[in-house]
UniProtKB/Swiss-Prot annotation:
Subcellular location: Plastid, Chloroplast thylakoid membrane
Gene: ndhA
Protein name listed in UniProt: NAD(P)H-quinone oxidoreductase subunit 1, chloroplastic
UniProt entry keywords in alphabetical sequence: Chloroplast, Membrane, NAD, NADP, Plastid, Plastoquinone, Quinone, Thylakoid, Translocase, Transmembrane, Transmembrane helix
Record field: catalytic activity: a plastoquinone + NADH + (n+1) H(+)(in) = a plastoquinol + NAD(+) + n H(+)(out); a plastoquinone + NADPH + (n+1) H(+)(in) = a plastoquinol + NADP(+) + n H(+)(out)
Membrane association type: Multi-pass membrane protein
GO process terms (BP): aerobic respiration; photosynthesis, light reaction
Coiled-coil regions listed: none
Domain of life assignment: Eukaryota
Keyword NAD part of the UniProt annotation: yes
Family, per entry: Belongs to the complex I subunit 1 family.
EC class of the enzyme, as a word: translocase
Protein source organism: Aethionema cordifolium
Physiological role: NDH shuttles electrons from NAD(P)H:plastoquinone, via FMN and iron-sulfur (Fe-S) centers, to quinones in the photosynthetic chain and possibly in a chloroplast respiratory chain. The immediate electron acceptor for the enzyme in this species is believed to be plastoquinone. Couples the redox reaction to proton translocation, and thus conserves the redox energy in a proton gradient.
Lineage, top ranks: Eukaryota, Viridiplantae, Streptophyta, Embryophyta, Tracheophyta
Subunit structure: NDH is composed of at least 16 different subunits, 5 of which are encoded in the nucleus.
Length: 360
């Protein structure tokens, strides 16, 4: 069989075209993940700057102002400083657990962002069980904190790790029961379906009005999961120095610092998605679906802006709560979770189930 030169060139060009298609496929596959990571990093930097500015205003002081315009680059400067600091390891601790703990906490929180719909058709992974996936992934983070406390070979670190695990278990159950109530109202476990179910009746169709008790319980439980005041028992400075972070320095300490803000941001995003209508505008005579049908790019941009606006509104509430309420004792924290929030969330679930079964 004789192959002419033109046929060889055709075969070579076809091979190059197929290789280019594979490269383009890889690029388009990683582009959404890269965009999400860039967006998360930017969101955390803005969140840190907002907390410092709001905290400064509450305490009647100036706050950061030298690193960039209005001090907006102060968080980036702190991150670079921690990046070049020495990583110390406890001489008698378990170095494996000590090193894995921070990474496990950060990775488990980052994976939770994959099920967040930032706008219509703008979600990294639209699973049918997206809510359960978030609960399962978020349950891994306390394991990393417990590993960090145990691997540090320090009594304060170990007590902080135990407190983090106990606190997470105590408030994970009421939070899950609230999510089940939302899924019953929406007839779905998908975050996208939950947002679309709230878009039928506009502003009054938000789950905030249909589940006010569940919203309050979810708000309290999410603050406890984020270990924010008044629930910052695992790292109480007056009692445990810095809790499970006591022996950490450098980039590992920075990972814990980032993890706390990542957790706060993901909790606020879930409040927006589950209770505040997600990307829906909820204004009279303006429909989100009409915007997407007219101009998909403009509609997606507006949806992202609305989602982030609702998210940062909730973050403002979380930040002001930090400087308003006093820290609870450990026994008060556990009693509040097991004896108060759990029965109320269970009753709310039973009431929601009754309404759905009898179509009241």
């Amino acid at each position: 069989m004789i192959i002419f030169a033109t046929e060889v060139q055709t075969i070579n060009s076809f091979v190059r075209l197929e290789s280019f298609k594979e490269v383009y496929g890889l690029i388009w596959g990683f582009l959404p993940i890269f965009s999400l990571v860039v967006g998360i990093v930017t969101g955390v930097l803005v969140l840190v700057w907002l907390e410092r500015e709001i905290s400064a205003r509450i305490q009647q002081r100036i706050g950061p102002e030298y690193a960039g315009a209005l001090g907006i680059l102060q968080a980036l400067a702190d991150g670079i400083k921690l990046l070049f600091k020495e990583n110390l390891r406890p001489s008698r601790g378990n170095t494996t657990l000590f090193s894995i703990g921070p990474s496990l906490a950060v990775i488990s929180i980052l994976l939770s962002y994959s099920v967040i719909p930032f706008s219509n058709h703008l979600v990294l992974a639209d699973f049918n069980i997206g809510i359960f996936l978030w609960i399962a992934i978020s349950s891994i983070a306390p394991i990393g904190l417990l590993m960090s406390g145990y691997g540090s070979n320090n009594k304060y670190s170990f007590l902080g790790g135990l407190r983090a695990a106990a606190q997470s278990i105590s408030y994970e159950i009421p939070l899950t029961l609230c999510l089940l109530s939302i899924s019953l109202l929406s007839n779905s476990l998908s975050t996208v379906d939950i947002v679309e179910a709230q878009s039928k009746y506009g502003f009054w169709g938000w789950n905030l009005w249909r589940q006010p008790i569940g919203f309050i319980i979810f708000l309290i439980s999410s603050l406890a999961e984020c270990e924010r005041l008044p629930f910052d028992l695992p790292e109480a400075e007056e009692e445990l120095v810095a809790g499970y972070q006591t022996e950490y320095s450098g980039i590992k300490f920075g990972l814990f610092y980032v993890a706390s803000y990542l957790n706060l941001l993901i909790s606020s995003l879930f409040v927006t998605v589950l209770y505040l209508g997600g990307w829906n505008i909820s204004l009279p005579y303006i429909s989100s679906l009409e915007l997407f049908e007219r101009d998909p790019i403009f509609g997606t941009t507006i949806g992202i802006f609305i989602t982030l606006a609702k998210t940062y509104l909730f973050l403002f509430i979380s930040i002001t709560t930090r400087w308003t309420l006093l820290r609870l004792r450990m026994d008060q924290l556990l009693n509040f979770g097991w004896k108060f929030l759990l029965p109320i969330s269970l009753g709310n679930l039973l009431l929601t189930t009754s309404f759905q079964v009898f179509s009241l």
